[in-house]
UniProtKB/Swiss-Prot annotation:
GO terms for molecular function: hydro-lyase activity. This is Enoyl-CoA hydratase domain-containing protein 3, mitochondrial. It comes from Xenopus laevis. One of its GO terms (cellular component) is mitochondrion. Keywords: Fatty acid metabolism, Lipid metabolism, Mitochondrion, Transit peptide. InterPro entries: ClpP/crotonase-like_dom_sf, Enoyl-CoA_hydra/iso, Enoyl-CoA_hydra_C, Mitochondrial_ECH-domain. Transmembrane segments: none annotated.
Length: 294
């Protein structure tokens, strides 16, 4: 059971397809396979772009504790690899993620297990901002509760026009307090509170209007547009992007004066980098930069 039922969404279709795993291996997922033999997440990597697929559509890609741990493991896998430039998080089926598995939140699991669920999830969400590479959510379908939190926590989010977003915990007696942390930092306060108080879903276009997602595209263009953005990032300097991302989140937590002080210092630091000087020289010389990622 997951948050999705409070939104009336139908069960996602069965698993299907073949996925290329890191290092060129492949695994066929048969629709008749038992769940215990099916990976909760699937990791692919090519040309510096890592795609992590939430792979449990029968359970609406619920963020159970094992799912959270699997996602975290895939994100941290060789995270310092200089060839890794972008991470994309997508999902199999017509639900991006329905949030926490409500069966794990019943009394028989106990308080300690509940704390482990929420603490592990919080570490995952904060991990996105500490990674040196951008993280993109590719959303197709419904994202509710912790699933909506996941979208809000990513650096960039591209959604299909069929996507919807909600924090419906209030309707089952469990306020979406942890999703509210990410949601409240992604959209205006009054929009966040209306979503949290009512549990009503918003459309992809409203999510774009309020800043929860970066872009909305037709469903058939979702993957190509997400890949286009990822490839564009791959054309930049790894070290410059890493510095810029870290600085952006650091300055957001500071006062206006302190933020400008920090970023002024970082701009000077950036100029001292090899790629900082290479970029300026290439612009003046009207040629493409040759990045050394240093």
């Amino acid at each position: 059971m997951s948050w999705l039922r409070s939104c009336g969404e139908r069960t996602a279709p069965a698993l299907r397809g073949t996925y290329r795993i890191l290092a060129g291996q492949s695994r066929f997922v048969n629709s008749s396979s038992h769940l215990q033999h099916t990976p909760l997440t699937v990791l692919q990597q090519e040309h510096g772009i890592r795609r992590i697929i939430l792979n449990n559509p029968q359970q609406r890609n619920a963020l159970s504790l094992p799912m959270i741990q699997s996602l975290q493991k895939d994100i941290l896998h060789e995270a310092d690899d200089p060839n890794l430039r972008v991470i994309i998080i997508s999902a199999e089926g017509n639900v991006f993620s329905s949030g926490h598995n409500l069966k794990e939140l019943t009394a028989e699991y106990g308080k300690d297990y509940h704390m482990e669920v929420f603490n592990t999830c919080a570490k995952l969400m904060t991990l996105f901002q500490t990674l040196p590479v951008p993280v993109i959510a590719e959303v197709n379908g419904l994202a509710t509760a912790a699933g909506c939190q996941l979208v809000a926590s990513c650096d960039i989010a591209v959604a299909s026009d069929k996507s919807r977003f909600a924090t419906p915990g209030v309707n089952v007696g469990l306020f979406c307090s942890t999703p509210g942390v990410a949601l409240g930092r992604a959209v205006p306060r009054k929009v966040a509170l209306e979503m949290l108080f009512t549990g009503e879903p918003i459309s992809a276009h409203d999510a774009l209007l309020h800043g929860l997602v970066s872009k909305v595209v037709p469903e058939e263009n979702l993957k190509s547009e997400t890949n286009r953005i990822a490839l564009k990032i791959c054309q930049t300097s790894h070290s410059v992007v890493a510095l810029g991302k870290s600085t952006f989140y650091r300055q957001m937590a500071k006062s206006l004066t302190d933020a400008y002080k920090l970023t002024s210092e970082v701009m000077v630091e950036n100029l001292a980098m090899k790629d900082g000087q290479e970029g300026l020289k290439s612009f003046i010389q009207k040629r493409k930069p040759v990045w050394t990622h240093s």
